[in-house]
Every structure is written in structure tokens, then in C-alpha cells.
């Protein structure tokens, strides 16, 4: 499948469930093609989980199976190994056996990520930045493709742990679905997308198609003048009044 058709197919596939949010969907797919991670900051019930599940169902592997999807509900009592996995001693073989955690899924939904402690939040840093998971003395690769979609409620102020700058820097975009327009909200009432439309979503793109489209983004020509303008914008955030901490070079 041509790379442009891959992007269009994914956009149309998500639009079949997520109604009236074209800008959100396009930015979602841009992040996917750039191999980035997403932070969704929005109120409950606006479709964050549905969006993540829909995307996972649109892509199949070489055997026709959809991408694996895991949802991690972040709570104050969550532990790092609940995310990464743990080595368990097998009494029969008298050796340690690794039990992988949900971070080894293709699409990982980190739900309400700011409700757990910084120690647990940091369990995501290595895999998001370096594409690897270290448990004990062994380093393992996550699934391919791999993406973290984290959510947080923008109005909560009690019982939360704001994301540290180091972790915020791992997300390519921070998006908000927002409330739908009246017609789109009526469509949600009539169709109940998460229960009626989501099960109907079938794979329309293979992992090979997705990798090809992702590789193509690395070949896009960017004029030196445009790169210079991007660098100037990023650098200006570090001296702008009212900005506590400017953007890192990663933002470019």
C-alpha cells in the first residue's frame, strides 16, 4: 500500500468511530507515523480510550491478528514491575522465568498517568526514549510497532503527581479531544461508538505498511532555511518571558 494511502486509511478508519474530530485524528496519525508517543489531556468520557482501541484494531500483523492493546490503570499503589514485568522463580526448573508486563504490548494506554508516584512514572522513561525495557540485568525490546498513549484529567488537583519534565519531554504531542459538536454528540447518543462501532472495526493496514510509511517520514526533504527557523523557535522558548523551562532540542 502506498504511504499516502496508509495515512489516509488510518485517518478514515479512526473517523468511522471518533466523530467530528478530524484535527485530533490527523495529529494522532502524524504522531504515529513519526514514531512518537501521545499525551491526551481531557475530561472523562470523551473517547480517549476508544481512540486508542480503534487505532490498535486498524492494523494487523503478518498473520492477520490485530495489534496487542494493554490498558494500565495508574493508581497510587501501582509498582514499577506491574508495568515492566518481573522475574519469577520457577520451582520446577529451579530457575527464574520472566513474566512480561503490559509495556510489551503494541499499544499501551497509560490511563490517568498522573495518579501514580514519580517512581512508577519513571518506569516508562526508558522504553519511551530508548525503545528498550531493562528488568534486572536483562534488556529487552518492546513490540514493534510500539506506542504509549497516556491520559490525564486537567482539572484534578488532589491525589495526583504532576508529570516531571523528563517524562513530558518523551511525548511528541499533547492533544485534547474536547467536547463534540451537537451533531457529533447526537451521533454518539444514537450509535454508542465504544460498544456498537468499535467491534466492527477491521484491520485495513498491515504492520509492514505502517513501517514503510514510518520509514518514509525520515526521507521527507526539509530545506535548511526551514530547519533554521525551527531551531530559532525552539531556542526562543528558553528566553521567553513567562516560560519557566524552554523546549529541549528534542522539540525540533
Please name every model-derived segment:
Residues 2-46, 235:
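Pre-Walker A (pre-P-loop) alpha-helix and adjacent loop at the N terminus of AAA/AAA+ ATPase modules
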Residues 27-30, 89-109:
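Conserved alpha-helical scaffold flanking the Walker A/P-loop in AAA+ ATPase domains
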Residues 32-75:
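Walker A/P-loop
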Residues 42, 111-112, 123:
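Walker B catalytic acidic pair
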Residues 43, 83, 151:
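P-loop (Walker A) phosphate-binding loop of NTP-binding proteins
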Residues 75-94:
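Conserved NTP-binding/hydrolysis module of P-loop NTPases
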Residues 90-94, 116, 120, 128-220:
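Canonical AAA+ ATPase core
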Residues 221, 237-252:
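C-terminal helical "lid" subdomain and adjoining coupling/linker elements of P-loop NTPases
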